[in-house]
Structure formats: structure tokens, C-alpha cells
């Protein structure tokens, strides 16, 4: 003879004759187990989740409490993450701080961990060529005050001859070969 036993609620020890919720290897009336954060019970059929700490959570509170948070939007990350400079991001939120370009592959950052694309990183540290607006990464550059140039882009503003390794004069923020400077400013 086959007999079917009626489960007993772990909380109230009464028989469960209708909906039985199994959580943590135990049977419950849905209204006798609730989310550890908001207290919501699961009598409406919503999902009961077990957190890594062994407590019951509704899906929202489980994510809010345990899912990694995006450094940019502060929301829980479900699925793929981008981890960089000790921080976690939604892949689409790992962006250059200046231009918001999504960063994939190579990226650059400053000492405080702020992500920048190559151009804006070199701009931030002062290594963009004034002429071409591209990063100076070869290690060779000409510095005039706080302005930097690739050696091949450091030329007289009037005759366009290269000024690398030769004397030059400055008028305002422009550089001239000695000959053109004398012609223009006597």
C-alpha cells in the first residue's frame, strides 16, 4: 500500500495542503518565509532565492546585496562584467572619462584609476603634439614652455622649416626661425 505524506511547514510545523515552497532543503508555507531585506513573503508565487549567506531573498534584493556593482552607474551587473584598474563595470559603461568612448582592448588611466582613451590620457598628462593633436609616445618631443611637439612637427610658423636642433624665437605662442623672426618683428 502506497501512502503519500503531507509535508510539514518548517516554520509553523503545520501540514502544507496547498502551495509548498521548498527552500534550503526544507518545506514552507509561502507566507512563512520572507526576504531577509524587505520582508516580502513568497505567497504571490515570486521566486525565493538563497543568498551566499544562507538567507532567503527576493530576486531584486539578492542582486542589490550580492551582485557586483558598476562603478559608473552604481547598478547591479547581471552577466558579463569588465574589470579594470580594480573596478567593475558593465562593459558598455567602461568609457573614457572625457569623450565617453567605450574602451575595449588597450586603454590608459591616470594614477587615480580614472579610465581614458589613448588621446585623452596623453592630453591629461600633457603629451599631445600641438600641431597634429596626436599622442607623443616615441619618447622624443620638443617642449616649448608647456607646449609639446613631435620633432617633425616643430617648424617655423612662417616658412615652415623644421626647427628641431636649430635656434628659434618665440612671439606669443608661435615659434619662428631666426631669419623669419627678424623679417617679421625686426
UniProtKB/Swiss-Prot annotation:
CDD domains linked to this entry: LIM4_Paxillin_like (cd09339)
Gene3D superfamilies with a match to the protein in the record: Cysteine Rich Protein
A molecular-function term among this protein's GO annotations: metal ion binding
Pfam family, one: LIM
Superkingdom classification of source: Eukaryota
UniProt feature coiled coil, ranges: none
Signal sequence range: none
InterPro entries: PDZ-LIM_domain, Znf_LIM
Protein name (Swiss-Prot/TrEMBL): LIM domain-containing protein DDB_G0271356
Lineage of the organism: Eukaryota, Amoebozoa, Evosea, Eumycetozoa, Dictyostelia
Amino acid at each position: 500500500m502506497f501512502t503519500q505524506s503531507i509535508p510539514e511547514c518548517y516554520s509553523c510545523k503545520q501540514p502544507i495542503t496547498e502551495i509548498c515552497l521548498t527552500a534550503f532543503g526544507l518545506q514552507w508555507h509561502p507566507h512563512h518565509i520572507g526576504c531577509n531585506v524587505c520582508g516580502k513573503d513568497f505567497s504571490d508565487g515570486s521566486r525565493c532565492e538563497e543568498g551566499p549567506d544562507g538567507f532567503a531573498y527576493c530576486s531584486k534584493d539578492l542582486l542589490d546585496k550580492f551582485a557586483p556593482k558598476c562603478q559608473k552607474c552604481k547598478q547591479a551587473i547581471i552577466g558579463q562584467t569588465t574589470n579594470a584598474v580594480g573596478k567593475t563595470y558593465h562593459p558598455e559603461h567602461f568609457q573614457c572619462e572625457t569623450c565617453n568612448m567605450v574602451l575595449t582592448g588597450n586603454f590608459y588611466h591616470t594614477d587615480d584609476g580614472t579610465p581614458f582613451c589613448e588621446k585623452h590620457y596623453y592630453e591629461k598628462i600633457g603629451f599631445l603634439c600641438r600641431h597634429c593633436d596626436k599622442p607623443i609616445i616615441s619618447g622624443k618631443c620638443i617642449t616649448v614652455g608647456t607646449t609639446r611637439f613631435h620633432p617633425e612637427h616643430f617648424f617655423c610658423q612662417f616658412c615652415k622649416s623644421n626647427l628641431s636642433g636649430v635656434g628659434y624665437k618665440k612671439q606669443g605662442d608661435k615659434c619662428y626661425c631666426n631669419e623669419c623672426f627678424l623679417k617679421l618683428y625686426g
